Amino acid sequence: MRSELKHQAPEGFITLIREGMGKREISLNQLAERAGVSPAFLSRILNRQRGLPSDKTIVRLGEVLDIEPVELLLIEAGRIPEAFKTTLSRPQIPALLRATGKLSETDMQKLIKMAQAFALRHAKGKAK
């Protein structure tokens, strides 16, 4: 029985999908069609009768449901988004994440803008 539970979709993932369907007023059949999966497949996931789909399908579900950021759905699925893997492997990142937990929303927005400016400057430097 334990192995069955291990392969079920996590509750947070299911909740995000169901909430997204409610907000977008989209049926299971419509979501399945737009995400490129069968309604039966999606129903089994949402009813905890099947494990998670591929990362590509998870991202597609998030896009169809306008879940922002779409990476949130991957995280709720227990997966690390590919774009985050390289960043998280840098030794400075854990210290940065710990420090940001204490910032106000305003300071967090300033930090994001600074990081984006640094990234843009770095990208331009590599383009030369």
What do the PLM-derived regions correspond to, one by one?
Residues 36-53, 60, 75-79:
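Recognition helix of helix-turn-helix/homeodomain-like DNA-binding domains
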Residues 78-128:
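Interfacial/linker helices and their anchor residues that mediate assembly or domain coupling
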Residues 56-72:
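DNA major-groove recognition helix of helix-turn-helix/homeodomain DNA-binding modules
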Residues 27-32, 61:
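Short alpha-helical "recognition helix" segments of helix-turn-helix
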Residues 17, 31-32, 42-45, 72-73:
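Conserved hydrophobic/aromatic packing and binding residues within compact polymer-binding modules
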Residues 1-26, 110:
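A short, Lys/Arg-rich alpha-helix, primarily the initiator
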